[in-house]
Regions:
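Membrane-embedded alpha-helical bundles that constitute the cytochrome b-like, heme-associated redox core
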Residues: 1-225
Length: 225
């Protein structure tokens, strides 16, 4: 599960970077520009290349392995604790709220991944793969505005980003611990790195959602709708 988790973090790094290109477009005045001029349009074009087409099934397999193994481990731990789970015991130093709720956080994250895919993947890659329709560059910006133009949608996504933050802060360093790449010296360093990465991801994604809202509602000029 640790290997699949680290693999998914790498994909999240790519995904966050491409989404943040939309913010760069706003700063440079290239919102709505075609691929080659607009950063976000270029990123979306890259996500439709054969390299990514090959990666998508691998990513889906990685998600499946991660989810199934997480469920097996959680059920095994639940059964192993038995009545002990009701007892009051001293909490170890390494325990955290996130570590005790990884399964719940994972379910929330998974649910929103499906929700997110219904808004973006289904309207872009799915259309190109299964319907043979080319998605125009301006459409990716319009999709961003339509999705984040509603303040409630932005707030829902921010809740998702918060759950993702908690899941990543524990999952990152514990993945290295599981494969034996962590010790007393590196544990705190990996925890700090995990916190920094999770914060960077979630701040970038939150800013992207807010920028989409501001453009869609005319606060920032350049709407394509």
């Amino acid at each position: 599960m640790s290997i699949s988790g680290l693999f998914l973090i790498l994909f999240l790094l790519l995904h966050t970077t491409i989404n943040f290109f939309a913010v760069i477009d706003v700063l440079l005045g290239t919102w709505g520009a075609p691929a080659g001029e607009g950063w976000y349009a270029s990123g979306c074009w890259f996500m439709a290349t054969p390299v990514i087409d090959i990666m998508v099934p691998i990513l889906a397999l990685g998600f499946a392995v991660h989810i199934i193994y997480a469920g097996i481990l959680s059920y095994g731990n639940y059964k192993a604790r038995g009545e002990v789970r009701y007892a009051v015991a001293n909490k170890t130093k390494a325990e955290s709220w996130a570590s005790k709720n990884m399964l719940v956080l994972g379910v929330i994250v998974l649910g929103f991944v499906a929700f997110h895919m219904s808004h973006f993947w289904a309207e872009m890659q799915y259309v190109e793969w299964f319907k043979g329709e080319h998605v125009a560059p301006e459409s990716v910006y319009a999709l961003m505005e339509l999705t984040f133009g509603n303040i409630w949608m932005v707030l829902i996504y921010i809740v998702w980003f918060a759950a993702l933050w908690f899941h990543l802060t524990h999952g990152f360093w514990s993945a290295f611990q599981t494969i034996g790449w962590s010790n007393k010296v590196w544990e705190k360093r990996l925890m700090l790195l995990g916190n920094c990465l999770a914060t960077l991801f979630c701040v970038c994604l939150t800013v992207t959602a807010i920028v989409g809202y501001l453009v869609a509602n005319g606060v920032i000029p350049g709407s394509v709708l």
